[in-house]
Amino acid sequence: MSGDPGLEALKARVAEVPLGPEIEETGRIATLADGLVEVEGLPGARLGEVVRFAGGAEGLVLTLDPETVQVALLDPGAALGSGTEVRRTGQLLSVPVGQGLLGRVVDPLGRPLDGLPAILPEARLEIERPAPGIVDRDMVAEPVETGLLVVDALFAVGRGQRELIIGERATGKTSLAVDAIVNQAASDIVCFYVAIGQRTTAVRRVIETVREKGAFARTVFVVAPATASPGLRWIAPFAATSMAEWVRDRGGHALIVYDDLTKHAAVHRELALLARQPPGREAYPGDIFYLHARLLERSAKLSAVNGGGSLTALPIAEIEAGNLSAYIPTNLISIADGQIVTSAALFAANQRPAVDIGLSVSRVGGKAQRGALKAVAGRVRLDYAQYLEMKMFSRFGGFGDAALRARLARGERIGALLAQPRTTPLSTPVQVALLAALAEGALDDVPLEDLARLKAALGPVLAADASLGPFRAAPDRLEPETRAALLACVRRAREAP
């Protein structure tokens, strides 16, 4: 009998059965206020651990005190009160990840908000994960093409970069990010849009825009609206980043938009004050910089040894009265790899996108730009900045010098070229053709009001030119014959009805 394989297997299974006592650590709610619970009696609790209340509601351990634990509620509708039993789960908070999230609208825990069946995850990842180390990263050298001429030509965003979009309320910050998502409809980049504390109607508009433009199937929407509990709003960017990291860690490419981190900082302050943490500048707790640094550092371009995937971040921040030197904006600017600043004055002047050329910058820039675009975009920013300065001084008197008048006229054309309606992306070949024509003076006699029609007509003309097929597929070099063909296309587009 001792040699019976079935008996040996049974013995092995019996040996794995734990025979000792099962120990559960429980506590009780001491106080409950505004989505934060103070629990007594969980001495072994860990930061980030999930606890379960009587009735099934869950919470997240945020702070540890000598006698109590502060827990953020993740189920705001739960019926809880003083004395309710709380149990440790021993597990850190995790979220579902996988292809099943594509084209779905979920809350930060991965629960559907779109009325469709539950997500079937391929795995689960903890919401707090370490950022890739230095040796695990690669240089940011591939572009994320947004389809916006002002961004792709002047402030190029690379795969693995963190480019902050910052400006006053209602100046087109979300529109910039949504345009970048829409332009990925036919690319290999998976997009994640994270709504933190936004109005439900605003989130619905974003979702419908992405759906109408054909990018919905490759986008994941993680929504924690203003009506969600503070705990859900707090975990939203971390949970969505873990979902996006699953794509990156398998060699894929992801783009994540945080809309917005100013509201995330506000909910962090709210929870910290409820937990009686010492307030610092503007009543934010002392770890506010670390909060966003550890979040944004998770966006990276991985080395080939680690799969070569990338996670690009477009965090959004709101400022008041144009004050870029406020606490949260300066924190985010110092963490990110550059910023795109939207201007209320430009927005009021009907300039779309309302990007302030002088205050915006990309610390990666040309390193991640297509070679052909880099070749023709070199002087555009300088010329436009000089035009804005001369335009300001021209209010005090006319310019008699013909050369100065020509520079003013050129600057006006640059501004008209950079103007772009929402969700009308321009391909890289079209951008190269426009900037090459500008550099050659081929647009100097085009009336400003006709430039919008020219941009719309140029795409089909380029697509119909068979000689530009290789360039359309890989616009990395601008050979003389290619430049000539592009200029010929611009001339044909000018003549188009």
Curated annotation (Swiss-Prot):
Q: Which Pfam families match?
A: ATP-synt_ab, ATP-synt_ab_C
Q: Which UniProt keywords apply?
A: ATP synthesis, ATP-binding, Cell inner membrane, Cell membrane, CF(1), Hydrogen ion transport, Ion transport, Membrane, Nucleotide-binding, Plasmid, Translocase, Transport
Write out the coiled-coil annotation as residue ranges: none
- List the GO terms this entry assigns under cellular component, sorted alphabetically: plasma membrane; proton-transporting ATP synthase complex
- Enzyme class name: translocase
Where is ATP bound in this sequence?
Answer: G167, E168, R169, A170, T171, G172, K173, T174
Please state where this protein is localized: Cell inner membrane
Site Required for activity — annotated at S360
EC assignment? 7.1.2.2
Q: How does it sit in the membrane?
A: Peripheral membrane protein
Q: Catalyzes what?
A: ATP + H2O + 4 H(+)(in) = ADP + phosphate + 5 H(+)(out)
Which InterPro entries would you find in this protein's record? ATP_synth_asu-like_sf, ATP_synth_asu_C, ATP_synth_asu_C_sf, ATP_synth_F1_a_nt-bd_dom, ATP_synth_F1_asu, ATPase_a/bsu_AS, ATPase_F1/V1/A1_a/bsu_N_sf, ATPase_F1/V1/A1_a/bsu_nucl-bd
| Entry's Gene Ontology molecular function annotations | ADP binding; ATP binding; proton-transporting ATP synthase activity, rotational mechanism
KW Transferase (keyword) present? no
**Partners and quaternary state?**
F-type ATPases have 2 components, CF(1) - the catalytic core - and CF(0) - the membrane proton channel. CF(1) has five subunits: alpha(3), beta(3), gamma(1), delta(1), epsilon(1). CF(0) has four main subunits: a(1), b(1), b'(1) and c(9-12).
Entry's family note: Belongs to the ATPase alpha/beta chains family.
- Biological function: Produces ATP from ADP in the presence of a proton gradient across the membrane. The alpha chain is a regulatory subunit.
Please state what the protein is called. Answer: ATP synthase subunit alpha 2
The gene designation is: atpA2
